[in-house]
């Protein structure tokens, strides 16, 4: 199948910023990056904004965030994990007329546009409902989802499901083996955020 040129696949972006950040001990979204002028959520919006349009940020009710150049949606079911928030983000993307959305956690500062583009290209080539990276484990929150899965999410949540794995297991999913998993790194401490990582080769 012919390769699709970069940026030809319409793709929305959803940043899940409303997690409880128990291991961090503070809100990850507003954690300043080295240099202190940009927060983690601003950084993630900037990465996704290079490839995705529109971009949505899912936040908890009352969660303080810096002023962002994208819509902020408040989680209607806080405390239930990422599945309901993902569904809300997918629905917003679908209402914006976009068929695919890249969904990620807010704590992935080493995420690359190249990874996002690769997953989007695979989603179009295979027509899979979900395309997610795999490096020994599934990365549900760094994946491309069809936005029409929003209804399926609502059904799963209504049945008591809380895990992203429930959505992937109920969908036509394609797992992409990642030779370099550094872009998928989640930061769970301020020290981890400030620790430099070697660039990929």
From Swiss-Prot:
Keyword annotations: Cytoplasm, GTP-binding, Magnesium, Metal-binding, Molybdenum cofactor biosynthesis, Nucleotide-binding, Transferase
Binding site for GTP: 16-18, 28, 75, 107
GO CC, alphabetical: cytoplasm; plasma membrane
Family: Belongs to the MobA family.
Free-text function comment from the UniProt entry: Transfers a GMP moiety from GTP to Mo-molybdopterin (Mo-MPT) cofactor (Moco or molybdenum cofactor) to form Mo-molybdopterin guanine dinucleotide (Mo-MGD) cofactor.
GO MF annotations in UniProt: GTP binding; metal ion binding; molybdenum cofactor guanylyltransferase activity; nucleotidyltransferase activity
Gene this protein is translated from: mobA
PANTHER family xrefs: MOLYBDENUM COFACTOR GUANYLYLTRANSFERASE (PTHR19136:SF81)
Subcellular localization(s) per the UniProt record: Cytoplasm
EC class: transferase
Protein's UniProt name: Probable molybdenum cofactor guanylyltransferase
Positions in coiled-coil regions: none
Cofactor(s) recorded in Swiss-Prot or TrEMBL: Mg(2+)
Binding positions for Mg(2+) per the UniProt entry: 107
Enzymatic reactions: Mo-molybdopterin + GTP + H(+) = Mo-molybdopterin guanine dinucleotide + diphosphate
Annotated EC: 2.7.7.77
Record InterPro entries: MobA-like_NTP_Trfase, Molybde_CF_guanTrfase, Nucleotide-diphossugar_trans
Main location: cytoplasm
GO BP terms: Mo-molybdopterin cofactor biosynthetic process
Organism: Mycobacterium tuberculosis (strain ATCC 25618 / H37Rv)
């Amino acid at each position: 199948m012919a390769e699709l040129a970069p940026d030809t696949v319409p793709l929305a972006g959803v940043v899940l910023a409303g997690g409880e950040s128990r291991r961090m001990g503070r809100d990850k979204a507003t954690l300043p990056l080295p240099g202190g002028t940009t927060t983690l959520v601003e950084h993630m919006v900037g990465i996704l904004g290079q490839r995705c349009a529109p971009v949505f940020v899912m936040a908890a009710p009352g969660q303080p965030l810096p002023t962002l150049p994208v819509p902020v949606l408040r989680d209607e079911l806080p405390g239930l994990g990422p599945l309901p928030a993902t569904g809300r983000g997918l629905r917003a993307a679908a209402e914006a007329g976009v068929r695919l959305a890249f969904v990620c956690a807010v704590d992935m500062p080493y995420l690359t546009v190249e990874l996002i583009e690769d997953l989007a290209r695979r989603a179009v080539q295979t027509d899979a409902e979900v395309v997610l990276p795999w490096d020994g484990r599934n990365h549900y929150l760094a994946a491309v989802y069809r936005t029409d899965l929003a209804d399926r999410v609502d059904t799963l949540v209504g049945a008591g499901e809380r895990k992203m794995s429930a959505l992937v297991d109920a969908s036509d999913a394609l797992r992409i083996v990642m030779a370099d998993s550094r872009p998928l790194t989640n930061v769970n401490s301020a020290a981890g955020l400030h620790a430099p990582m070697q660039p990929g080769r």
